[in-house]
């Protein structure tokens, strides 16, 4: 649904219950979109979220294939270097 239709739908729904203006509804939509973008940005850069790492990062490094390419976590590369070191 386009932004204009979504805004119009929200305005019509909210105007039945409250005395909000079209500008109030637009401001609310923009606020929610900013919050969603910030939450997505935080989720990508938050080091406390281990689920964003590939599953092999949480496994035993000795049991992994040392030639396997891993992406996404610096820790996995460090572990891989330790496994490959002579």
Curated annotation (Swiss-Prot):
Biased composition regions of type Basic and acidic residues, renumbered to the chain: 76-86
Keywords: Early protein, Host cytoplasm, Host nucleus, Host-virus interaction, Inhibition of host adaptive immune response by virus, Inhibition of host TAP by virus, Viral immunoevasion
Chief location bin: host cell
Cellular component GO terms held in the UniProt record: host cell cytoplasm; host cell nucleus
Compartments in which it is found: Host cytoplasm; Host nucleus
Record InterPro entries: Herpes_ICP47 (IPR008026)
Region (Active domain): 2-35
Region of interest (Disordered), residue spans: 33-86
Biased composition (Polar residues): 62-71
UniProt GO BP: symbiont-mediated suppression of host antigen processing and presentation
Domain of life, per lineage: Viruses
Residues flagged as site, Binding to TAP1 subunit: 22
Similarity comment text for this entry: Belongs to the herpesviridae US12 family.
Described purpose of this protein according to its UniProt entry: Plays a role in the inhibition of host immune response. Binds specifically to transporters associated with antigen processing (TAP), thereby blocking peptide-binding and translocation by TAP as well as subsequent loading of peptides onto MHC class I molecules. Empty MHC I molecules are retained in the endoplasmic reticulum and ultimately directed to proteasomal degradation. In consequence, infected cells are masked for immune recognition by cytotoxic T-lymphocytes.
Free-text comment about domains: The N-terminal active domain blocks peptide binding to and peptide transport by TAP.
Record note on quaternary structure: Interacts with host TAP1 and TAP2; these interactions inhibit the loading of peptides onto MHC class I molecules.
Protein's name in the database: ICP47 protein
